[in-house]
């Protein structure tokens, strides 16, 4: 949606920094394979091949549903990390309903489609993710980490998951 469209490359690096920081802070970094700054929006965060794959007929419906719900939470948190980092860290302002409404609506749609979540359940998941991401990016240290990560990404252009995690660790995240 338009709220996640990038104004320029700097905006894009901060969005990617926000997603990466959120993945690591939420302990979901195992899903990340690579970061590509020059990729099209939506393709900058390369996830591991099994992320989003739920079609194994040997898995129980409960396991598949739980995996889908976990991935919805991870994706929601990443989208929120993207916009929160860009707003809090780069623009130095808070979120508005114009920032969050498109993400909330996407969570409702995806939650219904992939997890059979009712609107109130999808909204609760969204609010939990927003609360977590807000707490992460309220720390001034995280602002410094995000800015340094964005600068390094701009210089390198690509990073493996391991390089990104090591960089965040060296910057004090963990």
Where are these regions (language model features)?
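Soluble catalytic regions of large protease machineries
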Residues: 1-174
């Amino acid at each position: 949606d338009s709220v996640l469209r990038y104004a320029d490359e700097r905006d894009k690096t901060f969005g990617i920094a926000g997603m990466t920081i959120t993945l690591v802070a939420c302990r979901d970094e195992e899903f990340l394979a690579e970061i590509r700054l020059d990729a099209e929006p939506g393709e900058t965060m390369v996830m591991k091949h099994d992320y989003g794959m739920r079609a194994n007929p040997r898995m129980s419906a409960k396991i598949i549903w739980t995996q889908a719900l976990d991935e919805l939470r991870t994706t929601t948190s990443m989208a929120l990390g993207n916009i929160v980092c860009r707003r809090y860290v780069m623009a130095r302002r808070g979120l508005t309903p114009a920032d969050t409404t498109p993400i909330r609506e996407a969570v409702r749609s995806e939650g219904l489609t992939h997890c059979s979540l009712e609107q109130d359940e999808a909204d609760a998941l969204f609010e939990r993710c927003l609360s977590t991401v807000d707490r992460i990016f309220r720390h001034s240290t995280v602002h410094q980490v995000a800015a340094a990560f964005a600068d390094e990404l701009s210089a390198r252009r690509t990073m493996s998951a391991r390089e990104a995690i090591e960089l965040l660790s060296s910057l004090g995240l963990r």
